[in-house]
Amino acid sequence: MHHDNFRRLGNAAFAAAAALLAVACGGGDSSDGNTNPNIKPANIGTVTIQAYDGATDDLLTAGLGKDGLASATAPVPASPNSPTAAELRRYAIYTNYRAIVDTTAGGGFGSLYGPNVDAQGNVTTGQGKIAGVEYLAFSDDGSGQENVTMLVQIPNTFNQSKPCMITATSSGSRGVYGAIAVGEWGLKRGCAVAYTDKGTGAAPHDLDTDTVPLIDGTRTTRSAAGTNAQFAARPGILSLADFTAQVPHRLAFKHAHSQRNPEKDWGKFTLQAIEFGIWAINDRFGTVASNGVRQRTLAKSKIVVIASSVSNGGGAAVAAAEQDTDGLIDGVAVAEPNLNLPPNASILVKRGSKPVNASGRLLYDYITTANLLQLCASQATALVNAPAFATNQFYISRCQTLVDNKLISGTTVSDQAASALDQLHLAGWEPESDALHPSLSLFDTAASIAVTYANSYARASVTDRLCGYSFAATLADFKPAAIAPSVLASMFATGNGVPPTSTVQLINDRDLQHGPFMNGQSVSASNNRADANFDGAKCLRDLLTGTDSQAQALQSGVSQIQRSGNLHGKPALIVHGRSDGLLPVNHTSRPYLGFNRQQEGAASKLSYIEVENAQHFDAFIGAVSGYSNRYVPLHLYLIRALDAVYDNLTTGKALPPSQVVRTIPRGGATNTTTAPTLLPVNVPPISASPDAANQIAASTGSVDVPD
């Protein structure tokens, strides 16, 4: 679609002429004005519409305001065992907003970004509450098993003369409010925001009680929910009842256990959210014909649409732009996207004119590599001052197991950990990510992601316990236990869709010494060593190249989630933190830039912005000691990317070229959460004409990033 500064006099004249021609040719009975009815997309089910006044409740902060979002006091439900839908919504917005951005004043919240900072970057005295309406519905393929949540927010400030919309597909494996902090940009601009949980979600199917979540997060029994369940697990070889009798207290999560490999459809679901958004906008603002039928007054050609989000949501936005055959998307602005290139893309990535050690690998490839090596690498002497560093006997034991399996070398723990860190470098992690390995290890990040994606790609049932893993709440003895009713009742709001989350942990069901046991403290059966389940990590890794039925199923799933690289000439900005330790730039945004040039050539309008001293989890900046000293918020650069793409689409202003942005860490005492206040000088703008030393060069099949 093309937008000429919202001036469409020529289009209007053409439309008028077309209407006259239709009448002259006897086209249609328009005597009642019902010429273009606003038909709800066929995939959309029952729609719930809720208005929010912008005072007691609102679209962005659920009535909490800027101060409420920043408060450490969560808006817990009045009756924790039976929260209302409204309470769960408020709690979900609070939790998910704080999971994406740093909400500390020292980190820039309230001064450089946040609800009280307006669309022009001015700090206001208000709380940033935004009145408007929400449209909520499932998208389904007719089976009642897909039930992807769709949500559209339309602020009361929506400008019908300059209509706009952005997408905010959920990040990670989160629920529909997972990217509410991204939606903030659109709401402030008076744009509609189209959200989707993309077939993932935070609330589990509790197999003990056989209860499941509904679309609003409230829970009921599986039989009572029927096809209205947001997610209900299906059995594998065993029935769910037989499985639970043998293996009690387990939980099934939609991303891991839906048996649908939802990632293959993240682009489709994002496009469906846009279509739902267009319908909702016209349901609200379309003219009504004399026969009472609402019309599609604001056609998609009149609405500026930017696909946006972060992490998995950012990858979904890129996928949607690639798959957009109907002109739904005008531009793309994403941060730290999960991008999987085809193994044969053969993109050469260079840093400082020197080829990097590895690039363009699939997420499942590098996350299973991290799952083997990262725990040991976190013990490296070079990382003793890194955030969350601590000597860990389980990780030290992992080092020895890696040596025994000839994956690293060394006779001392120091040498072994250094070897593991070197192996991560050889696998494509940049040295700037080194300081992140201890904290990512602490949260068992690589294991939880590897297990989730292995199950998803292989379309495994929860009853399959792929590689001997399951999900369950644990108590002080680290063994599976019944999840507390109050915790389960609020997991729609508090969970992130993968363990560890809300007391739920990853379980090693093959620990012969303890029985089922929390993964990070468990014993490998192959060596009777408490090495945080090396056996499970190796099993997950072997699925990538194995030949048995489970490995073949996983490899088939992986083949379905790869990008094409063709954005069809859409203006696009990708921002990514150079230090990202979860989705390393060498495997994601850097090679995608080259892949896009390979596919589009001179037609490409993609720019890539690499931000120094930025990493994947902005929320950790104010929460984990040591992050605030080292890292700046990438979220601020997503805001700037959205500004740039919007300006390009509405005024024709050129997008900034690909570049490295040289930020300045806040500094201060090492490993505190109270670094000096983030100032504008710490986070310089994206340059319209970067110095030569900061320019990223891209050509067909090649990318060169300066040091």
Curated annotation (Swiss-Prot):
It catalyses: (3R)-hydroxybutanoate dimer + H2O = 2 (R)-3-hydroxybutanoate + H(+). Belongs to the D-(-)-3-hydroxybutyrate oligomer hydrolase family. Pathway: Lipid metabolism; butanoate metabolism. It is found in: Secreted. This is D-(-)-3-hydroxybutyrate oligomer hydrolase. The active site is at 311 (charge relay system). Keywords: Hydrolase, Secreted, Signal. It comes from the Bacteria. It is an enzyme of class 3 (hydrolase). HAMAP family: 3HBOH. It comes from Cupriavidus pinatubonensis (strain JMP 134 / LMG 1197) (Cupriavidus necator (strain JMP 134)). Residues 1-24 form the signal peptide. Participates in the degradation of poly-3-hydroxybutyrate (PHB). It works downstream of poly(3-hydroxybutyrate) depolymerase, hydrolyzing D(-)-3-hydroxybutyrate oligomers of various length (3HB-oligomers) into 3HB-monomers. GO terms for cellular component: extracellular space.
